[in-house]
Amino acid sequence: MERERLIDIVARILRRSGLKVARVELRGGCFDLVASGLFTLLFIKVVTNIDTVTPEQAEDLKRLAKLFKATPMIVGVRTKNSEIEEGVIYERFGIYALNPATLYRVLIEGELPAIFAERGGLYVRINGELLKKLREKHGYSVGELASLLGVSRKSLLNYERNEQAVSLEVALRMEELFDEPIAEPIDVLRAKVDVELKPAEPETPLEQEVFEKLKELGMGVVKVKRAPFNALSREDEVTILTGIDEKKTRSTVRRAEMVAEVGRIINTGGLFVLEKSKMEVVSEVPLIPKESLKEIKDVDELIELIEGLKREIRKSI
């Protein structure tokens, strides 16, 4: 399946579920779609082959998710070795990966998957406490149940302590034996993100100037390499998607438009700082010269500058 068609399918599933969706068209970007609802915020990377996601893209995707208390997700149709199975969760760099059919079942049908793929096959996590209660209720010793399931006593005890995943084959035997569901669903919409938010490391002299000024204003700055913006600048509840360019180009304008689209979905403002530029607004994202940023005294003044420029452009429309 072509990637563009796949992105369109995923976007339609998201919209059908009632989420607001923005598309980001950036070569090599860490996410392609951002979707939000009342209790849901997703940053999604869409690829045909989930093994083509790079470690750098994954780290940026996880940073965004952690900063916005969102869920990162990869949607694809195959790995380098096989098709992605419906109803099965895969994982790449600590991010859940699934196919569009599974995403549909989660968002539209409210059905959370329980099966995940790892080297060696398909597995589930089970409720170990429930397994122990069922074993005791049916009068099985550890050895007897282990023998019935075809596993070692040690493995069975690990299952009961929630210390070991269970192969799908063994889990099905358990559920058939006890006539009760034991597998724990995987809440792919509430995934925990494990990533370190390192201090921003500038790649250009202009980035260094901008980052230093933002830090001087009391903002935390997190560098994001594979997104329409260069960094996330944050102070308390204020977050600014911050773009940096030497001068205004077609690429700058397109990036600003994408920042505006993303900002509308996640309720966050944007700002582009250029080496030299007149003050203007592109799709409600202000473009300002670095000299104007240097004159700012605090975060409140920066926000007022951004909002003031947006008000001016609205009046002129």
Curated annotation (Swiss-Prot):
Pfam families associated with the record: HTH_3 (PF01381)
Residue span of the signal peptide, if any? none
Annotated GO molecular function terms are:
DNA binding; DNA-binding transcription factor activity
| DNA-binding among keywords | yes
Write the record's keywords in alphabetical order, separated by commas. DNA-binding, Transcription, Transcription regulation
PROSITE patterns in the cross-refs = HTH_CROC1
Q: Which residues bind DNA?
A: 142-161
- Kindly give the SMART domains that the UniProt entry links to this protein: HTH_XRE (SM00530)
User: Domain named HTH cro/C1-type: which ranges?
Assistant: 131-189
Q: What is this protein called?
A: Putative HTH-type transcriptional regulatory protein TGAM_1316
What organism does the record attribute this protein to?
Thermococcus gammatolerans (strain DSM 15229 / JCM 11827 / EJ3)
Phylogenetic lineage: Archaea, Methanobacteriati, Methanobacteriota, Thermococci, Thermococcales
